[in-house]
């Protein structure tokens, strides 16, 4: 998660409980929230940490709209889903049981999602290299891109 999100600041977490009929319509989150000291946090990445075991409720999927189509998530308790905050998302109606989640937002060192994804891909390639000149050049490229794209 750290190499994909590159967090520099976190919002305060929020907790949500959805019972039967509970849902949250498709929306986009605020561009800025505040941390525990009242300082603004640019919301580059949203996260949902699932606290209820998926077997204890029906419905209540996290719906994320993606250019490739809608994706629904109902992972096991303790799992988190991260996605770019600007993507439309919502929660489908709960039909049985209770859905408990923790949600929050991350300000990334790298503002743009496409740049974060490119860096993540390069680091995955780098992790498969044994070393040598090619690995050094890849490390240099990743570092230079971070200096070029990184913000505080």
Name what the model sees in each region.
Residues 1-46, 51-80, 86, 92-152:
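Fe(II)/2-oxoglutarate oxygenase catalytic core
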